[in-house]
Amino acid sequence: MDFNLTREQELVRQMVREFAENEVKPIAAEIDETERFPMENVKKMGQYGMMGIPFSKEYGGAGGDVLSYIIAVEELSKVCGTTGVILSAHTSLCASLINEHGTEEQKQKYLVPLAKGEKIGAYGLTEPNAGTDSGAQQTVAVLEGDHYVINGSKIFITNGGVADTFVIFAMTDRTKGTKGISAFIIEKGFKGFSIGKVEQKLGIRASSTTELVFEDMIVPVENMIGKEGKGFPIAMKTLDGGRIGIAAQALGIAEGAFNEARAYMKERKQFGRSLDKFQGLAWMMADMDVAIESARYLVYKAAYLKQAGLPYTVDAARAKLHAANVAMDVTTKAVQLFGGYGYTKDYPVERMMRDAKITEIYEGTSEVQKLVISGKIFR
C-alpha cells in the first residue's frame, strides 16, 4: 500500500498552498467580517485551473484526479473555509454531476465553461420542508410541449447568489415519491428564476448562501439530466462525492487551526517559558495531531476509491463524519490554547471554529452519516 502522493498531486498542493498564502489568507478576515464573496480570487482560481481539476482536458479541465482536487479544497480551507466550500460546491455538486450524468451536448454547453472557471456552479436540492428528507420535495416541474414549467423554491444554496449554472431537482410526478424526482440544468437568466433570501450565517460568512425562487420558470426539455423520474439517485450519488469535498474542507480547517495554535504556543510565554514547554498543553497538541492524521487517511481513501470507480458511499460518510468532528474539536481546542486572545478577532482561530460547525451539518448531517455507516454494519 503506497501512501505517497504522486508528483502531480504534490505539485497541485504546492501551487494551491502558495495561492492560498499569497491571495486567500490576506483577505480571509475581511471577507468574513463584511460577508463579501471573494470574486477576485475565484476568477484567479479559474485562471490557475483550480475550478476544473478532476475533469478531462477535453471538457476544459486540468486532467487531474479526485485526490488532487480534494487536496486543493484542503489547502484553501487551511486559511479560509469559505473559499474551500466555494470550490467544493462548484466542483463536487454541480460540475461533477454534469460530467457524470450529462449528455455530450450538456457537457459541451455547461461543463466546459464550469471547468474553465468561466462560470460558477451551484446545486439546488434542499427546500424549506425537505432537508434531510429529500424525498419531500415541493418544487414541481410540468411538461408543456418543448419545455418544463417549474414552480417552487430551494434554500441554503451555496454559491446561490453568484452562480451562472445550477443543477436543481423537481417533482415531475408527485404520486411516485422519490421516483418522481427529476434533475434539471438551469441558468441564472432563465425566465421566472430569481434569487430570494440571502442568508446571514455563523460561519463561512463570505460564501453566497441564498434561496432560489422559481415562478413559472421555463426550462427546455434538453436541460433535463438523465431520464424523467431518475433524479433522486443522481442527487444521492452526487452528495456522496460532495461529502468527500466537505470532509476535505473540514480537514483543512482543522489543520489551519492546528498550525495557528502551534505557532502561538512557541511564541507565547507564561511563568517564564513558552506554552509548548507545558506538558499538558503539548499533549493537547499531540491529541489534535493524531485526530487530524486519522481524518486525512479517511478523506484521502474516499477520494482514491471514487477515482478508482470503486464503491465509496460508506467511506465518504466515514470521512465526513470524522473530519467534521475533528474540525470542531481541534478548532475549539485551538481557541482554548489562545486563551482570551482566541475569543477575539485579533487571531483567526475564532473564525475557524465558526467555519468548522457547518461541516457537521451540510451535505448530510453527522447523524445522517451515522445512519449510512450503521446501515452497512447491520445489513
Curated annotation (Swiss-Prot):
The keyword Oxidoreductase applies. GO terms for molecular function: flavin adenine dinucleotide binding; short-chain fatty acyl-CoA dehydrogenase activity. It is an enzyme of class 1 (oxidoreductase). Pathway: Lipid metabolism; butanoate metabolism. It comes from the Bacteria. Its cofactor is FAD. It catalyses: butanoyl-CoA + oxidized [electron-transfer flavoprotein] + H(+) = (2E)-butenoyl-CoA + reduced [electron-transfer flavoprotein]; a short-chain 2,3-saturated fatty acyl-CoA + oxidized [electron-transfer flavoprotein] + H(+) = a short-chain (2E)-enoyl-CoA + reduced [electron-transfer flavoprotein]. Keywords: FAD, Flavoprotein, Oxidoreductase. Its EC number is 1.3.8.1. GO terms for biological process: butyrate metabolic process. It holds the Pfam family Acyl-CoA_dh_N. Belongs to the acyl-CoA dehydrogenase family. This is Acyl-CoA dehydrogenase, short-chain specific. It comes from Clostridium acetobutylicum (strain ATCC 824 / DSM 792 / JCM 1419 / IAM 19013 / LMG 5710 / NBRC 13948 / NRRL B-527 / VKM B-1787 / 2291 / W).
